[in-house]
């Protein structure tokens, strides 16, 4: 059985963690902002941030992005982008492939197609 579990990040309205078999997504309002995944069996973590993030607005989004990433502030996040620790991709294009080779849309479709699946939604809006 494959599960997708959705919860509010630290109980915050409009800030969501989406747990999937492929990894963990952070969604703010209606946009995917970040993804953390693991490379196969060696558990090497990789992180993608959406390349359309507006760094100058939505202070709540930036606050919860830092919490999701474990960064102290946005300056630290920007430094990790600069040094290659985080990669920028278009997470909100449903066909964008993540490192594991699947898009967010494909992950959800695959789970829905399986004979037994369970999704728990707490206010999540899929595009």
Question: At which residue positions do the language-model features occur?
Answer:
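Terminal leader/tail segments of proteins
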Residues: 1-127
